[in-house]
UniProtKB/Swiss-Prot annotation:
Protein name per UniProt: ATP synthase epsilon chain
Compartments where found: Cell membrane
Membrane topology according to the record: Peripheral membrane protein
Organism expressing this protein natively: Bacillus mycoides (strain KBAB4)
Disulfide bonds: none
HAMAP family: ATP_synth_epsil_bac
Length: 133
C-alpha cells in the first residue's frame, strides 16, 4: 500500500516523523481518516490520540489539541504538546490527573474550573494512550 510522510510537531520540535499508510484523528467536527492523496484540509483537533498505521503496526501519539494540515503529499499535526505512547510517564500522568481532580473539587472562587477540566482531559488522554502501546 502507498505511504506518505507524517510529522507531529510541538513548540519543542518534532515528536513523530515517519511514513505511514493511514492517519486517524479526532477533529472538532468528528473522526477523520487520512489516506495517501487526501484532499487538502486544515482542521482543529480535540485532546485525543492520533493513530498512525503502517502495515500491521499502529503507533499512537497523545496530542493536547492543535491542528492537522493535510496536503496531498504530506500530513502535519501541530500541537502544544504530544507524546508517543511508549514515552508517556504514567506516574507523572497519574499525578497530573490527581491534581486536576483536586482543583475541580475545591470550592474556592480562585479556581479556574475550565483550566482544571482541560488538565484532567489531557492527563486522562495520556493515560489512555499509554495503555495502547
Amino acid at each position: 500500500m502507498k505511504t506518505f510522510p507524517v510529522s507531529i510537531v510541538t513548540p519543542d520540535g518534532p515528536v513523530y516523523e515517519k511514513e505511514v499508510e493511514m492517519v486517524s484523528v479526532k477533529a472538532e467536527s468528528g473522526e477523520m481518516g487520512i489516506l495517501p492523496g487526501h484532499i487538502p484540509t486544515v482542521a482543529p483537533l480535540k485532546i485525543s490520540a492520533v493513530r498512525l498505521k503502517n502495515g500491521g503496526h499502529t503507533d499512537y501519539v497523545a496530542v493536547s489539541g492543535g491542528f492537522i494540515e493535510v496536503r496531498p503529499d504530506k500530513v502535519t499535526v501541530l500541537s502544544s504538546s504530544a507524546e508517543e505512547a511508549n514515552h508517556i510517564d504514567i506516574h507523572r500522568a497519574n499525578e497530573s490527573k490527581r491534581r486536576a481532580e483536586q482543583r475541580m473539587q475545591d470550592k474556592q472562587a480562585h479556581v479556574d474550573f475550565r483550566r482544571a477540566e482541560m488538565a484532567l482531559q489531557r492527563a486522562v488522554n495520556r493515560l489512555n494512550v499509554s495503555d495502547m502501546k
